[in-house]
Amino acid sequence: MTIPELPILWRDNAPPSEYEAWRSRTFNSKRPDAQPLAIIKPTTIDHIVSATALAKENNAKLALRSGGHSLQCWSLRKDSILVDLENFRYLEFDDATGVVSVTPSVTSSELLLFLANKKRFFPSGHSGEVGLGGFLLQGGIGLNARSYGYACEYLTAVDVVTVSGEVKHCSPDENADLFWAARGAGPEFPAIVTRFHLNTRPLLPTVKRCTYIWPAVCYEMVFKWVLEILPTLSDDIEPTIFGFTLPNTPIPVIAFHAHVHAESDESAIELLKPLHESHPAGAMVEQDCVDTSVQQEFESGHAIMPPGARYFTDSVFLTPGTDIIEACREMFTTLPAQAAGSIAYWEPMKQRTKLPEMAWSIHSEHYVSLMAIYGDQNQDHKQQTWILDCFKDMDRKGLLLGTYVGDAHPKDRPHHYWSDPAKERIQKIGVQWDPEARLRGTIFAENTL
């Protein structure tokens, strides 16, 4: 069999415009200036093996890109061999087991459309453009994580190419250390994933939502209502609270948004009934039991978070027992107004008694995130500072259990991304499988970008 020619651009001899187009394939236009030594867009596993050999020959770091949606832009590392998996694509469903096998560059939208034809579902990312690679390796806070669990919990096996160029299958029974790390080690995973094998769920055919928006001065009233009603809500309802400023909202507002997956319209309406019957008065917008779909929700999110804007975000898990209303009051009610938008986000996580045996090891009942969306690069320092300062202040008060590794800022706000035992094990696995630190080192080492 003839192996297709390696699709590669070398920094020093590629047409500058073509090299920059390949380099800058990121959702976030606030990206590092780091210039990879070469960029490879593999279409075969042999191409990926060749990339590892080139990294060794050139004594270079390896960097990976799946969907390019990482707001941290970790795929850009100075003088690295960047393996962009955009064209390395595969989707297959096993009818007998309900397991779907996918490559890292397959997006949430693509996976769910594919599974819908099989009447199956997977708790993918909240954005349709999110590639599964980074999403799963970082744990996967996906659709209705409160009830459906973290996406990495659905992983049954993973296929990888090691930094030494070996092809491995990893499962609880084979290369179990790599399988353990694949569920939550994030950018410290010391191999290149070529395929994820994922359990799926039955597809509930009906999706409806409720959305209510109030002025931010109603913050306490809204949060109290949500916390009181939360224990009574169906597991098939995903409730969230947003605080935001957008160009068409000159004052900060607070929004409650919930969608439900159900067997029928009647069932969905009944499940949402407690929300539209009890929500606080004074809402500027009231939308009860509106027909929707996951794809429609993806499109709505796309309008708020367009590709090519500048983004800065940070996300945390609050310490158990924290007074959520007091802890988050300032971040939800004093968002800075700007040209594109500021978003504060809260989603409840269900505290299961025990997580599966995996690297993902820090979570609590409350997940909170801040995001700045803007266009002017001269605003970078300002936008970064208000978000980091907010969480640094909360950390000084003992309110933060840990930080979501997918939004980590290891230089500007180092924090806990795993439990101490999990962190130690991730480091040991990294040294074993990537002794020269070609791939690992984004979190644990400095000067890697």
From Swiss-Prot:
Recorded GO MF terms: FAD binding; oxidoreductase activity
Q: Which UniProt keywords apply?
A: FAD, Flavoprotein, Oxidoreductase
Q: Which SUPFAM superfamilies match?
A: FAD-binding/transporter-associated domain-like
Provide the function of this protein. FAD-linked oxidoreductase; part of the gene cluster that mediates the biosynthesis of the indole diterpenes janthitremanes such as shearinine K or shearinine A. The geranylgeranyl diphosphate (GGPP) synthase janG catalyzes the first step in janthitremane biosynthesis via conversion of farnesyl pyrophosphate and isopentyl pyrophosphate into geranylgeranyl pyrophosphate (GGPP). Condensation of indole-3-glycerol phosphate with GGPP by the prenyl transferase janC then forms 3-geranylgeranylindole (3-GGI).
The name of this protein is: FAD-linked oxidoreductase janO
Q: In which pathway does it act?
A: Secondary metabolite biosynthesis
Residues forming the FAD-binding PCMH-type domain are: 32-203
The cofactor named in the record is:
FAD
What Gene3D superfamilies does the annotation carry?
3.30.465.10, 3.40.462.20, Uridine Diphospho-n-acetylenolpyruvylglucosamine Reductase, domain 2
Q: Which domain of life is it from?
A: Eukaryota
Q: What is its EC number?
A: 1.1.1.-
The family line of this record is: Belongs to the oxygen-dependent FAD-linked oxidoreductase family.
Keyword Flavoprotein set for record:
yes
